[in-house]
């Protein structure tokens, strides 16, 4: 179970304990638990009719009257009018957050949730919307309301991949999950056992020789990532009678309350992989384990919930967080991370995007919407121009030309005659707002809708179309699966680099920290591997829900058991000499050393490929400072989140007075997966480089974590999320003069990333004696603090 110290590490506070006071764990009271219980139940099987009688009664009325709200605007009025005219997006239809007609209705619904004066009004509206509003729109609006309401700190929803597993797993798996029936499963298991007993006794085999080297069934369609075949398992449901696979499960499976809580839950898992398993569509399919990773996609989803394009900076205080710069910097960082993963497979630069040339890499997401309609796919060498909406294309390309032109000119004159200087570093905020197409853009007439139109164009959705075919590019939680996403967003990042090109390069005097020298940095071994994890997909169950004395009995859970990239914990130790006591910030970056041809990339070019992995405050003493930093302490990363099943059980136990529910029981929604910090690397070692820099502490307007509780909140809009006020990515944010760049308070370190094949023991004939059963003897050690290769 998470405790405050664990989150301190995840948020990069451990090394700054002298600067930020420690924080005691807060325990939820009865009122909080009532609200948390409501939120968990209201999204349970969200595509099915609501079955909780208490919530059905709560939702008998929707409060449309202005007196129930702190603010009442045009979008709320339009939503109400659409409801009266039966013009809302129907339940069961595909919802796209980047479909213009859908987004306008979602904004109205969000406002009804966000501006509700009290919990009673909010809960009534949510319960009503759960029964009457499109499921996708409902979850989208509810997620943003829970994140942004100031009186909801600590409240949470299940992860988006637990609410809608259909958006993250292939249609074959979804079909098996939705038709799962416990009684039928029991019968099939019994029949299979009887059949196998007869078969092997008749043929004189025993279970230790269930396959031979001549068995075609063992070798056919074999792929090295198919761990279930290596263990002799099929793609169907198995009972999970030991423990849920998760990297931090050792925190739970030794706790008596957790064991007692979970013993009555029937747990089942089914092996599932990525699109590469069903079809190697093109070479990009090799990267599907990364681009379709649940944590990778969820990070982008929550970033765009935190800083949604229709939330204005003044009302929601997003301007305090440098929302435009932060969004654009995240685009850059995600592209850098993706590029490093490409290098692990010998792929080169992310291809350039063109509106008028073929898109070489097609994509088939193999997803199915919960209404049964499959997602559209794109063929290899697809020509978008052939199927274009030319009016929409003109608007999109016109925007891009306009923004490139104003960056080159160095200023912009708005429609009301105001001139903005684009040669100042802080102008990156305006550029970021324009590129995101958010409501804080300088001229809403020109810049607000281009981003949405671009995604609609990719999905062949018209301006006012309501009935839209499912497409991954229309929702934040699915778009990063598509290789075209990275091509298109590379063109967005190029505007960022174009803007930075016109800013003056940092001089040696600006980069130098007098009296401080970084003498050495020792980095431990960097090793990646593929582990297995269970994702909670219980929301896809279709069996009858059981209630006893009015209480819901959660007696069964389904899990998707999936292979995913991870890394061993690593550390680095700084040796820094200082002439006096100094308040500093230490930054760490990871970047490539060579391109796909083995050629060294110059620093002037390579700066765009570095990804910042750590940043923390420290007080140097006079003399030599030895500072050890663990990978678990990185400021923006999180471990595996507690599953939906466990969170609901913890809530109910606490509600009944049998458990103290800590508000930091799960990880903050905004964190980047710790396990994806390192690219896969090579078995022989992939050469990379790390960059470290110590800079003077430049205090932000609000001291980090001073205005929100960092143990369970992301502090969106607080202005206190960042350790200092330097530009994001400093000193790689601007072009580099290599004659001026290198100073004593910097340090470059050549490193190698090794990849260990954890499945190798199963490749050999008869190397696994328990063939036909999951190997808990190996994974029991695998999921402990002491796991070693």
UniProtKB/Swiss-Prot annotation:
GO terms for biological process: energy homeostasis. Keywords: Secreted, Signal, Storage protein. GO terms for molecular function: nutrient reservoir activity. Its main location: secreted. Larval hemolymph. GO terms for cellular component: extracellular space; larval serum protein complex. Gene3D superfamilies: Di-copper center containing domain from catechol oxidase, Hemocyanin, C-terminal domain, Hemocyanin, N-terminal domain. It is found in: Secreted, Extracellular space. It comes from the Eukaryota. Residues 1-16 form the signal peptide. Heterohexamer, composed of three subunits, alpha, beta and gamma. Larval storage protein (LSP) which may serve as a store of amino acids for synthesis of adult proteins. Belongs to the hemocyanin family. This is Larval serum protein 1 beta chain.
